[in-house]
UniProtKB/Swiss-Prot annotation:
The active site is at 398 (proton acceptor), 484 (proton acceptor). Its cofactor is FAD. Keywords: Cholesterol metabolism, FAD, Flavoprotein, Isomerase, Lipid metabolism, Oxidoreductase, Secreted, Signal, Steroid metabolism, Sterol metabolism. Its main location: secreted. The keyword Secreted applies. Belongs to the GMC oxidoreductase family. This is Cholesterol oxidase.
Length: 546
């Protein structure tokens, strides 16, 4: 049997495990042949050789490769497994009529586009629930993160972009870029099932009129665009358009989850991890504290809650190998808390530092009445404006959809800029949380870069900005939230060059907190590839060698 056949078989076994978990209605997910000890530790507390905190990109890579190496591994996920339909027959709700499934314990949705014509017509009152999208609000920056098995892969737009090699070498100079671009990026893209849109279909379909309009307008300003690969199955999307399958991307689904079409991590890495028979996932379990045990291992205090937020149990789970894959916010907070409360006192001062929003700035332009963008829009982006030249004004701008179900004449963009400003997480004893030290002024370089680009497009086309989409005030640039949190445990500073946390043995960071605040494109492919690189070395040198 070939390696690819082994992987396909593991995926099938893993998908069966997810299906069985849905039928059982429990929080423990494992293949039938998974070790009883791991299941017991998941249910009751106890010891398991390896624990991975989180189920996002870096966590999923680590769990799969540990499972393949024969290491019994427990993944702890604070969100739920999203595979049980709600009253409407769908697992996820759409963007236009969100309900409690949309949001992580909110009384009201907090969509990135919060208004239209300055009217509060976008967000809805909802019941607090363990929903799929969280907006974590700090003093002057908010961050969108996914909650559930699969993490951010459940709620992102799926744009699978590799960074410019020159910029990758600038931000991570101690990582061998040849290895990354020759081995680990291809491995990540293959596992993530990255695919490309049929360009002929793109040119003909009504669903991407919005992107073609933005491309034409960028061209008038002398700017080029590039097609962007995705983990959403473009072949499935074409069948959606033909009326052959249920719609998802063509039914305004994305930020609150896709019911069809998207190859999120539960269908790729995590399914393969479960299929090894060595990996167990425990949902609705949040790690609160980490301490080192006398034998050099780690003990975790873990809270189990239900989907209404009720505390059901507090457990202690111990392990020899601990991988933090809870994302830039989650992993950083756990380590900042551990350092500053004294449970891991040897963590260095770099823990919490080097955080950035990947230069994220959202903006929109008002088109002329004779230049409509289309009432029918795919929710999955397919084009980007590539104005990244490694200068301080570099921009890669995702041409974003605005699938409102009616004509808006709006061109929407998520600009990724080269903002050098960085924030720092510090421990707040009063709330027992990590507080982000970041000011709106620190986003001025990002706003200036985005403004320079879109001023150029507006001038070439005789258009203006939309000022009514980001709240009740006049505002053309949304600089107070981001989709791409990066940093907090930067590679080579808080850790060694492979994610080993400085000051401790067998403690690793494996997610976006390793990347120093910026990567110049949508970051999940880089996070995945970097995790592949790091865990390969860790398993060889730290796990199998011992």
């Amino acid at each position: 049997m070939t390696a690819q056949q082994h992987l396909s078989r593991r995926r099938m076994l893993g998908m069966a495990a997810f299906g069985a978990a849905a039928l059982a209605g429990g929080t423990t997910i494992a293949a039938p042949r998974a070790a009883a000890a791991a299941k017991s530790a998941a249910d009751n507390g106890g010891y398991v050789p390896a624990v991975v905190i989180g189920t996002g990109y870096g966590a999923a890579v680590s769990a799969l490769r540990l499972g393949e190496a024969g290491v019994q591994t427990l993944m702890l996920e604070m969100g739920q497994l999203w595979n049980q339909p709600g009253p409407d027959g769908n697992i996820f709700c759409g963007m236009l009529n969100p309900d409690k499934r949309s949001s992580w314990f909110k009384n009201r949705t907090e969509a990135p586009l919060g208004s239209f014509l300055w009217l509060d017509v976008v967000n809805r009152n909802i019941d607090p629930y363990a929903g799929v999208l969280d907006r974590v609000n700090y003093d002057q920056m908010s961050v969108y993160v996914g909650r559930g098995v699969g993490g951010g892969s459940l709620v992102n737009g799926g744009m699978a972009v590799e960074p410019k090699r020159s910029y990758f070498e600038e931000i991570l100079p101690r990582v061998d870029s040849s290895e990354m671009y020759d081995r680990y990026f291809p491995r990540a893209n293959s596992m993530l099932r990255v695919n490309h849109i049929d360009t002929k279909w793109f040119e003909d379909t009504e669903w991407y009129k919005f992107a073609r309009v933005s491309r034409e307008q960028a061209g008038k300003a002398g700017l080029g665009t590039v097609f962007v690969p995705n983990v959403y199955d473009f072949g499935y999307m074409q069948r959606e358009a033909a009326g052959e399958v249920p719609k998802s991307a063509l039914a305004t689904e994305v930020i609150y989850g896709n019911n069809h079409g998207k190859q999120s991590l539960d269908k790729t890495y995590l399914a393969a991890a479960l299929g090894t028979g060595k990996v167990t996932i425990q949902t609705l379990h949040q790690v609160k504290t980490i301490r080192q045990t006398k034998d050099g291992g780690y003990a975790l205090t873990v809270e189990q809650k239900d989907t209404d937020g009720k505390l059901l149990a507090t457990k202690e789970i111990s392990c020899r190998y601990l991988f933090l894959g809870a994302g830039s916010l989650g992993s950083t907070e756990l380590l900042v808390r551990a350092r500053d409360t004294g449970t891991l006192p040897n963590l260095n001062s770099e823990v919490g530092a080097g955080w950035g929003p990947n230069g994220n700035i959202m903006t929109a332009r008002a088109n002329h009445m004779w230049n409509p963008t289309g009432a029918h829009q795919s929710s999955i982006p397919a084009l980007g404006i590539d104005a990244w030249d490694n200068s301080d004004s570099s921009v890669f701008a995702e041409i974003a959809p605005m699938p409102a179900g009616l004509e808006t004449w709006v061109s929407l963009y998520l600009a990724i800029t080269k903002n050098p400003q960085r924030g720092t997480f510090v421990y707040d004893a009063a709330t027992d949380r990590a507080k982000l030290n970041w000011t709106r002024d620190q986003n001025a370089p990002a706003v200036n870069a985005a403004k320079a680009l879109f001023d150029r497009i507006n001038k070439a086309n005789g258009t203006i900005y939309r000022y009514d989409l980001f709240g009740t005030q006049l505002k053309a640039f949304a600089d107070d939230f981001c989709y791409h949190p990066l940093g907090g445990c930067v590679l080579g500073k808080a850790t060694d060059d492979y994610g080993r946390v400085a000051g401790y043995k067998n403690l690793y960071v494996t997610d976006g907190s390793l990347i120093p605040g910026s990567v110049g494109v949508n970051p999940f492919v880089t996070i995945t590839a970097l995790a592949e690189r790091n865990v390969e070395r860790i398993i060889k040198q730290d796990v199998t060698a011992s």
